[in-house]
Amino acid sequence: MAYPLLVLVDGHALAYRAFFALRESGLRSSRGEPTYAVFGFAQILLTALAEYRPDYAAVAFDVGRTFRDDLYAEYKAGRAETPEEFYPQFERIKQLVQALNIPIYTAEGYEADDVIGTLARQATERGVDTIILTGDSDVLQLVNDHVRVALANPYGGKTSVTLYDLEQVRKRYDGLEPDQLADLRGLKGDTSDNIPGVRGIGEKGAIALLKQFRSLDALLEQIDAAPKRYQTLLREQAEAARFSRQLATIVTDVPVQLDLEAARIGVYDRSAVMALFQELEFGVSSNLIKKLPSVVQAPTLAELPADLPAAPLTTAPTQLSLFAGESEPAQPTAEPPPVTIVRDATALADLVSRLRNAPAFAFDTECTSLQPVASDLVGISIAIAPDTVCYIPVGHQSETQVPCGEVVTALAPFFANPQQPKFAHNAKFDMEVLAGAGIKVSGLAFDTMIAAAMLGKRQGLKDLAFYELKLPEPPTTIEDLIGRGNKQISFAEVPVEQAAPYAAADALYTLRLTERLQRQLEAEPALHDLYYRVELPLIEVLTDMELTGIRLDQEYLRELGRHFAQRIADLVERIYQQAGGPFNINSGQQLNDVLFGRLGIDPRAHGLSKLKSGGYSITAEVLEELSQLYPIAADILTYRQLTKLKSTYIDALPDLVNPRTGRIHTSYNQLGAATGRLSSNNPNLQNIPVRTEEGREIRRAFVAEPGWRFVAADYSQIELRVLAHMSGDENLIAAFQQGLDIHAATASRLFGVEPTAVDKNQRRVAKTVVFGVIYGISAFGLAQRLGIERDLARQLIDNLFAQFPGIRRYIDQTLEFGRQHGYVQTLFGRRRVMEDLRASGARRAAAEREAINAPIQGTAADLMKMAMVNVHRALREQGLRTRLLLQVHDELIAEAPEDEVEPAARLLRDVMSSVYRDLVVPLSVNLEVGPNWDEMSPLAMG
């Protein structure tokens, strides 16, 4: 017989688990409010409700001092103080429970465990089964035929839940029954709750005693029958055992009364939950909304909790607001207007007429691939006004639609008109898809994705629309239309009638978000200027770079692959010979067996500590150290390097060549790094090693077109020049202004010698110290890097600060600004949130290291982006055919016809060196030219 089911939630236990499990994620709203614990709690709770599908649910919370504290002053003593960030999130957790209309139970003088134990007993008496959802194993003592425990362990962003019934409890505790677990804690104690137990008896011994005597009382009555090693302990600490059991026993007669009708699932106001999720900026991608219980009926006004916050909720006053003076909250959006599907010439002509009179429009594309250059256009959506939205299908299968060529002819003039502003979300992607169909986009006036990222918001359109526009329900996702995994179909297979509302909504959301995000940027003048001066025009630059791509010498790469394969085979043979036989070199376990077993290497002699699995982590650093004594370690390290390069680049790159263009088209993430730097993927061309011969061999495969040359322009020591400007250090500024070798000049001051007397080692040390300091290195870290004593490393750092006091001043001022504001910023106002500067211990130390470097690295990234925009514009204005291809670290790589090499190089140097004239030190640009990415020669120009 199936009984009704009640889920009882240990609110405090789950809240704490979620807080500490997800703390490192740093999840926050764009206003700076920490939300990671709320998210983790919601994820556990809603997943459980979706999986167990209970009829009823209730939550119990602790309320402070309990009878156990009165019995034992040291109860739970020694626990770390609850971090401040927990409390506002705990209030949000209670708001979530209230919004779901789940009753909350508390009892003065009792813990949540006691309340849960009482409610579970009452449920059983009323013929209702119970699942207790908790993160605390103490409640396993409550398990019986009608009570189970779902024990949640949310770590690393994922939640593992184990459901314990009687059999599972017996398995965990080697045959003990749940009603023996309080006795177990009475014997072994509990360090987490500071329950003493019997000193000298651990869990293994306690379980053995309870299996022999069944109960603590029976054991204490027959101490003489216990193993001799325990007899004295038990006689001397019998009262401690009984007292510990009393502390560990969950009370089941707390003065609370279970109200099943109030606990019925599905009687809640869904809009209140939506409002809370929007306030916390939990979007569609989190999947929380899909896990919400179905609304059986909305609660009456009398049934709603009196203290349920009105929607939209306001930010707790204790939280930092990064956007003071933000525009007014959006009002909930009504149902989107009907979409016009442009299926024939008449509808297309009507759209053209509307576009002719439109002051601006938002657009979006649907296509067949996530790789825009390799994709086919399926449809275009256009929003001219909130009530004028259309979808133009051009590539759906078996559908009546206007031929793509006719659509392109009709719409291309509007997209190409620079005087007609256009808005998009992830415009670069859509512009590349349209370019493939023959439509060039000019006049891009706003990209909501880039604006959202600069404002510290989540960048997905569906998430952004949901919480910024206060949509009553989450938008349809692409997975809702095309499915997932093996069952996924192409968008071209989606019927137009289903595709149109989805596609048109994206354009409409973009139109509405543009107005809202524009106002938010206007409230932040520095970000507003950076957005319109750098990030927005950069979109066109990156679009052109990605569309251009770079040529790959595939025959050379095939030959290189054969060469690498032979080298790897030779290495494998040599490794086998040294190991005394073949083994799986890629297996960590087998590598452990060979190095520390068969070859007898002592891991402790090299400072290695065991993993939980019992083996040792054999990292590149470990192999580097071992290689000084054992040739096999050097060979294994080389084997790893070669196999990684071969699989990542040599084998993979040919598959990434676009058959339409014969070139590789990497994709740039405009805000891919927290500092604002660009990142690239598919493939990642920024990670190809440059300092090793193998890396240079791979770079040699990237070649210029016949009759063209690569021209590379590299900023020299840009981060140190930025440091000189931002620190205002006179000595550092003077060295750059005089054109000195900065590392030799630094070494001269650091070691107290004449610049001409600085040797190579002193220069190397000075370079390491300076870069280490601006990356927040400690004396310990510097000592390790240089292989010197820590005291000497500290002395070097102190000497640097003494000779360059502006650097010390910059560090102190940056950290103080970060602590006060919760973020640090570049010279141009780009922010990086640094809430952990207010934390303690290792988290604060890590945040301080990042905070010191972020403004420097971020400003260098801003300067590079400005240079890219200016170079792109100058090339066009001067009518040169030269085109930008790559941006790697501090370097721009262009491809120029042979007769344009010198003018292109001069343009690159002049534009890049003058990108920001207010810098107090000159920007120096080194030039190189060559037929491929490796064989580049310095280019000297007057």
Swiss-Prot record:
Keywords: DNA damage, DNA repair, DNA replication, DNA-binding, DNA-directed DNA polymerase, Exonuclease, Hydrolase, Nuclease, Nucleotidyltransferase, Transferase
Keyword set includes DNA damage: yes
Domain of life from the UniProt record: Bacteria
One Pfam family linked to the record: DNA_pol_A
Protein EC: 2.7.7.7
InterPro entries reported in the protein's UniProt record: 3'-5'_exonuclease_dom (IPR002562), 5-3_exonucl_a-hlix_arch_N (IPR020046), 5-3_exonuclease (IPR002421), 5-3_exonuclease_C_sf (IPR036279), DNA-dir_DNA_pol_A_CS (IPR019760), DNA-dir_DNA_pol_A_palm_dom (IPR001098), DNA/RNA_pol_sf (IPR043502), DNA_polI_H3TH (IPR020045)
Cited function: In addition to polymerase activity, this DNA polymerase exhibits 3'-5' and 5'-3' exonuclease activity.
Protein name per the record: DNA polymerase I
Stored PANTHER family: DNA POLYMERASE I, DNA POLYMERASE NU
The reaction(s) this protein catalyses: DNA(n) + a 2'-deoxyribonucleoside 5'-triphosphate = DNA(n+1) + diphosphate
